[in-house]
Amino acid sequence: MPATTSRLRAAIPARLLLPLFVLLAVLSLAVSACGSGSDKAGDQPHRLSVFAASSLTDAFTQLGADFTAAHPGVKVVFDFAGSNDLVTQLQQGAPADVLATADTASMDDAGSLVGTPQAFAGNKLIIAVEPGNPHHITSLADLSRKGLKVVLAAPEVPAGKYAQEALGKAGVSVTPVSLEVSVKGVVTKISLGEADAGIVYVTDVDAAKGKIDGVAIPGAQNVVASYPIATVKDGTYPDDASAFLDYVLSDEGQKVLADNGFLPAP
């Protein structure tokens, strides 16, 4: 037995030795637990923040799940909203790693906050109506019918801007009962019976089957929406952001978008 230990025991009364050793054992376990907790926390995936237009909700949710499955250290989290709202959030300092908008104008507004945008998908407009089309709407001209409750996205929102462009091509003037902050708001109002019709993306009708029906808009009156995506320059995880962007543009990512009704990038 080392002399130091012998001297220690001689200096400490026997009645105190057992409590002392118990205390040392408890402290040792506590330190080990703290170390184990730190390692566990370090193994948790970090959150890749993606700001995406509301019309991308279903497709990007699937893309995010697939990307997370292929990259266990990353968990993709989304903020879905109107494109202009997302850009405003970025301009006000909200943290994000990727931005995907429903039009090039909104992406342009992001300016130097983002890297070089790349178009990754397209979309077209459709008239959304209640299931069974009880008001027998067949064209954009019918939306000007007296007494018909029409809801549109606000003009500063891409879907609202595109809707006004389509109505202009058709020579139709509509006074909506409501202007929504995103295209999803239009879908919700119609599906709840609070409006009779509206103009949304084809993908919105596909995603809400059973809740709303769609009436096609002729090509000459329709508008093709272009969706750009870019990494955010001050994002926390630039490498993962680039990898997610590459996945969206990949054949696999494009198939997910096509399965959700999106067109190839125009």
Where do the PLM segments sit?
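Sec-dependent bacterial lipoprotein signal peptides
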Residues: 1-32
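Exported/periplasmic ABC-transporter solute-binding proteins
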Residues: 3-4, 30-69, 84, 88, ...
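Short, high-confidence coil segments that cap the C-terminus of an alpha-helix
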Residues: 73, 95-96, 195
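Acidic/His-rich segments in extracytoplasmic proteins that coordinate ligands and/or metal ions
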Residues: 87-92, 108-115
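Short, structured active-site "lid" loops
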Residues: 93-102
